[in-house]
């Protein structure tokens, strides 16, 4: 069964496990503004990692500030997207935040949306454009996203996809790169092929594949309000069964005065 870790009245979102699974980095609003925190995976007191006064509790059109994206493979830093570029608060840049506390440092990539480190930490797969929070479907305009790789050792970028549709939320599992695309009009998970067209590995028709997140062996994503796990080794997708235990006071019967509803 699922176990609740946070209970603050504000939002806690974008959780990411550390490489060894012992910690969780996430965004939260404990002190009014959205900041990045880290806590033990089994639960406990969160530690605040960032202190910059963000753009406010209501997100800009480009998305939430301080979005946690990944950890460095050595577990020493948390990769976050922060909205503080001089040419617009809608635009975000990747920063590395020490997991034990310290000054955040901007990465070489000038602007980006979703992104993730390669398993060896030498590259980042990312989208230069951030549009994950827009609600337009089947968008084919100038800000449709494509997937790129940035080589951190050589400070060089390479474009992987070039399609009028949206290609976003890229993740890395072993040697394979997966991303969400609506090139067939519903967002599904695709595998990048260096020598050919990307291959769809899920076939959802009713709802979009949203927020894919990867670990060493699998990709987990949301679809139609449910969580699914895709295993690249076997090419299988299965819906996760999540049980939330609790007293659920909102479901308990209670007496109310119904006089105003009687005519």
Regions found by a protein language model. Name each.
Residues 1, 6-12, 25-37, 41, ...:
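A flexible loop/linker signature enriched in serine peptidases of the S9 family
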Residues 18, 72, 118, 256-261:
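Structural signature of eukaryotic scaffold interfaces centered on beta-propeller domains
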Residues 19-20, 73-74, 119-120, 172-174, ...:
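Residue-level detector of Asp-centered blade-edge/turn motifs that repeat once per structural unit
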Residues 43-44, 101-102, 155, 195-197, ...:
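Short coil/turn linkers that define WD40 beta-propeller blade boundaries
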Residues 64-66, 216, 255-257:
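Short, surface-exposed amphipathic charged segments that create phosphate/polyanion-binding patches used
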Residues 110-111, 173-175, 194-196, 216-217:
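Short glycine/proline-enriched coil/turn segments at helix->beta-strand junctions
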Residues 134-136, 215-216, 263:
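Generic recognition of flexible, low-complexity loop/linker segments
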Residues 237-263:
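Non-catalytic accessory segments flanking enzyme active sites
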């Amino acid at each position: 069964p699922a176990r609740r870790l946070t209970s603050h009245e504000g939002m806690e979102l974008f959780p990411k496990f550390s490489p060894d699974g012992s910690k969780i980095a996430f965004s939260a609003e404990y002190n009014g503004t959205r900041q990045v925190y880290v806590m033990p995976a089994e639960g406990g007191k969160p530690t605040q990692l960032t202190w910059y006064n963000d753009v406010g509790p209501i997100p800009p059109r480009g998305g939430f500030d301080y979005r946690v994206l990944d950890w460095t493979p050595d577990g020493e830093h948390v990769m976050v997207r922060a909205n503080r570029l001089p040419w617009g608060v809608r635009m975000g840049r990747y920063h590395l935040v020490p997991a034990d506390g310290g000054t955040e440092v901007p990465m070489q990539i000038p602007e980006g949306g979703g992104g993730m480190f390669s398993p060896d930490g030498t590259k980042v797969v990312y989208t230069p454009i951030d549009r994950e929070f827009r609600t337009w479907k089947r968008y084919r305009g100038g800000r449709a996203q494509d997937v790129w790789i940035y080589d951190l050792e050589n400070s060089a970028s390479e474009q992987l996809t070039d399609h009028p549709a949206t290609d976003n939320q890229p993740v890395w599992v072993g040697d394979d790169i997966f991303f969400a695309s609506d090139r067939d009009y519903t967002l599904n998970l695709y595998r990048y092929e260096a020598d050919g067209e990307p291959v769809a590995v899920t076939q959802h028709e009713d709802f979009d594949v949203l927020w894919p997140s990867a670990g060493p062996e699998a990709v987990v994503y949301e679809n139609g309000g449910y969580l699914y796990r895709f295993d690249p080794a076997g090419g299988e997708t299965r819906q996760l069964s999540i049980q939330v235990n609790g007293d659920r006071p909102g479901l308990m019967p209670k007496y109310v005065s119904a006089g105003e509803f009687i005519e």
